[in-house]
């Protein structure tokens, strides 16, 4: 109905805005984003609905649809044999949450963008990711983020829409760069069990891929020098 449509449109606009905030949208995309914002304000005024409240309701609707779709995909996977599986370490809220860097560092690694906050020091950090898997190997990275124990986002690896396509080795190398940069500031970094299983294939006892000190220093300098 009209209200539900407005709620979903509000949430999808929020997701597109997050994409634009990462400076990944082209000019037509940004133009549509601005025009759609004006349209949503007008529709909200006509319907007497608050956009922020509508966005939260739209998020719940989208989450329900995705859960139903995942169940259907799982049934089809069982019926048809080998197929991609979508694995989630992060919730939709963790994926769409805004975050800011006090000392931003950024590196392009092929079709992947690595971002991190160099101001973070002496923290326990865990890497979480949402990605697809086929034949028990990482197929496509959707998004990877680094979280402190209190849930703050301090790093991220995301694919570039303008440069589609990456391998599991590309993702592994990007994760190594991110870990090296974070550990340069005496942070302790570990990866989620899902990432250990499908992206790294090996780890030490604390769930962190083994990285020699020399390699860590080299990767940290690389991130700093390429920004």
Curated annotation (Swiss-Prot):
Record GO biological process: symbiont-mediated suppression of host cytoplasmic pattern recognition receptor signaling pathway via inhibition of RIG-I activity; symbiont-mediated suppression of host gene expression; symbiont-mediated suppression of host mRNA processing; symbiont-mediated suppression of host PKR/eIFalpha signaling; symbiont-mediated suppression of host type I interferon-mediated signaling pathway
Matches recorded under SUPFAM superfamilies: Ns1 effector domain-like (SSF143021), S15/NS1 RNA-binding domain (SSF47060)
Stretches assigned to coiled coil: none
Chief place of localization: host cell
Motif annotated as Nuclear export signal, chain positions: 134-143
Positions occupied by motif Nuclear localization signal: 31-35
Post-translational modification: Upon interferon induction, ISGylated via host HERC5; this results in the impairment of NS1 interaction with RNA targets due to its inability to form homodimers and to interact with host EIF2AK2/PKR.
Region (PABPN1-binding), start-end ranges: 220-227
GO cellular component term, pick one: host cell cytoplasm
Family membership: Belongs to the influenza A viruses NS1 family.
Annotated protein name in UniProt: Non-structural protein 1
Organism listed in the record: Influenza A virus (strain A/Duck/Ukraine/1/1963 H3N8)
Gene name linked to the record: NS
